[in-house]
Amino acid sequence: MERATKAQIAYAEKLLRELGYDVEDYPLSEMGKREASKLIDDLKDELYG
């Protein structure tokens, strides 16, 4: 599994904070690229509708 990029992790953290989630609840540094991408897509859908 290819690990999530630093950019993916940083963007996911930004979205999580904007939505009021605790970043510590998400193992971002352990996620793969695909998993991080899906999380980002889900967070964007929640934030932007």
Predicted feature descriptions by range:
Residues 1-49:
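A charge-rich, low-complexity, intrinsically flexible signal that marks solvent-exposed coils, linkers
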